[in-house]
UniProtKB/Swiss-Prot annotation:
Compartments in which it is found: Secreted; Host nucleus, Host nucleolus
Gene Ontology annotations for the cellular component aspect, listed alphabetically: extracellular region; host cell nucleolus
Presence of the UniProt keyword Nucleus in the record: no
Originating species: Phytophthora infestans (strain T30-4) (Potato late blight agent)
Motif range (RxLR-dEER): 40-58
Described purpose of this protein according to its UniProt entry: Effector that suppresses flg22-induced post-translational MAP kinase activation both tomato and Arabidopsis. The perception of highly conserved pathogen- or microbe-associated molecular patterns (PAMPs/MAMPs), such as flg22, triggers converging signaling pathways recruiting MAP kinase cascades and inducing transcriptional re-programming, yielding a generic antimicrobial response.
Protein name, UniProt field: RxLR effector protein SFI1
Domain notes: The RxLR-dEER motif acts to carry the protein into the host cell cytoplasm through binding to cell surface phosphatidylinositol-3-phosphate.
Keyword line: Host nucleus, Secreted, Signal, Virulence
Family classification: Belongs to the RxLR effector family.
Signal peptide positions on this chain: 1-22
Major subcellular site: secreted
Length: 107
């Protein structure tokens, strides 16, 4: 019971301190605001703001990166069928080795 009280107290203190930072007192001088630029943009090139649908789980505005990554880094062309054949051969060799061990141990 006491631990719940301490958790609630810590939450209240953290919530109060973050809300104070979010809404500063307008009467206090704003020293840092003069040093920072007037307009800052954190958006990366190629990002666009998209309205999320109600069925996709986002329900609000979210950022989507434009599909330009394939132009920057090309995907290597790999023939997967060759890899599958090699894997099947390796599996057969492993089975044969296990059978050879079983024959030697049974003899």
């Amino acid at each position: 019971m006491r631990s719940i009280f301490y958790v609630a107290l810590a939450f209240a203190v953290l919530a109060r301190s973050s809300s104070v930072e979010a809404f500063p007192n307008p009467k206090e001088p704003q020293l840092l605001s003069k040093a920072s630029p007037d307009k800052r943009s954190l958006r990366v090139e190629g990002q666009e703001v998209v309205q999320g649908g109600t069925l996709d789980g986002n329900g609000g505005v979210w950022k989507a990166i434009a599909h330009t990554t394939n132009k920057i880094v090309k995907k290597p062309e790999i023939d997967v069928s060759k890899l599958i054949d090699v894997a099947k051969k390796a599996k057969k060799v492993k089975k044969l080795k296990n059978l050879m061990k079983l024959k030697k141990s049974s003899s």
